[in-house]
Amino acid sequence: MKEKYILSIDEGTTSTRAIIFDHNGNEIVSAQKEITQYFPEPGWVEHDANEIWMAVQTTIANAFIQSGIWPGQIAAIGITNQRETAVVWDKDTGKPIYHAIVWQSRQTTDLAEKLKKDGYSNLIREKTGLIVDPYFSATKIRWILDHVPGAQEKAEQGKLLFGTIDSWLVWKLTDGQKHVTDYTNASRTMLFNIHTLKWDKEILNLLNIPEKMLPEVRSNSEVYGTTASYMFFGGEVSIAGMAGDQQAALFGQLALKPGMVKNTYGTGAFIVMNTGDKPTTSNNNLLTTIGYGINGKITYALEGSIFVAGSAIQWLRDSMKLIKNAPDSEKAAYESTSENEVYVVPAFTGLGAPYWDAEARGAIFGVTRGTTDKDMIKATLQSLAYQTRDVVDTMQKDSGIDIPALRVDGGASNNNYLMQFQADILGKKIERTKVLETTSMGAAFLAGLAVGYWKNIDELKHVFTIGQAFEPKMGDLERKKLYDGWQRAIKATRVFAHGE
């Protein structure tokens, strides 16, 4: 009998990947395709949902071809995805009626501000765990219904469907047979009540979004359906695990005990803390969200979302032309001779947690005649670590838990300079996993558990391993001095955006 594997579809903000894992958690093959970014107006970010679907098909086919594995050897498919990004499509034709509005996009700022001014912030916070912000799906759906002629009427007639990217992909993979999402993705829409685990009728009425547009909400580990018979060279494969990218990473890191924290350095950086079976309300602008729901039990989490992380390194490469590829940033940072007096605040699309300032824009401080390109690169890398500390400090305040270590993953966690500086500025141990793609691994774990590929979570503990740890080396006085400088830079950035 041929060996069985798990296929993870990892649909991210800048690219789509298909990764095949074996029973020991080894990555057998990874196929990747970049996604076109559309910027119709300043601050707007959109994707073509059809292009995303084509990229998923291409990467899956390439993974099979490169590995020699055939669909009959796939025990299950797990899906993980960029969250909040909103797709609205025609139920009959299966065609999107507008581009997918991406989580980073600020085109619905006016709608979010109106909700705040009308006094709905507390209601929405209490029900969804989220703050009112253009980041989440709700205002994106409202924007599409407002700006596409006839869309509201069609939605009310049940002719339009909404989904986050997971929902869109399951719809396409099952040839329109299943319109479902999972607890984690639903909890990021600003429409889902995280206490009742249902779409919230009061918020839907407030935004005039018909509930019939919305997908059925399911757990993170169960069989949702099978792929259509004409796909994957004729093999029908169970789709059995789904989670938004950051919750998938939390599960992939096996951060399954209250107080465990992970940071994924992707396009943005996302720090998530397991808070157990009761939601923890933040007094400092962190998000209360669903970590995962399996076997009839919900685990909640606190999250701090940083909008710009890996995309700051892309900015160095693509816009500033200071590096040719991302790994060059590590070498440049080590070669910089500056005393860390330069600060880059990469608020290209506003500031995320704990500030939630949609109007802030990027700024650079402390530049002298002697500042070099390497100093700028180093300061940009350091900005990821400073922003992470902003969130970790806030999590400790909200939870009352002293976080002993931070588990890290994602592309930028491969940068040794950044990881050491992260340990130094936090004064905490950094644990980098052996498999950096824990987002895909988490989706694989969820799918594998659903079909018995792995018997239970104890079996997963033998699969997961820490690759390298970074201990803090910086003294307390130096740490305080550098972080004080960062806080001044943040304050000045916000003053510039808003005036005194």
From Swiss-Prot:
Main enzyme class: transferase
UniProt-listed PROSITE patterns: FGGY_KINASES_1, FGGY_KINASES_2
Gene Ontology cellular-component terms listed: cytosol
InterPro entries per UniProt: ATPase_NBD, Carb_kinase_FGGY, Carb_kinase_FGGY_CS, FGGY_C, FGGY_N, Glycerol_kin
Catalytic activities: glycerol + ATP = sn-glycerol 3-phosphate + ADP + H(+)
Name of this protein: Glycerol kinase
GO molecular function, one term: glycerol kinase activity
Family: Belongs to the FGGY kinase family.
Species the sequence originates in: Lactobacillus acidophilus (strain ATCC 700396 / NCK56 / N2 / NCFM)
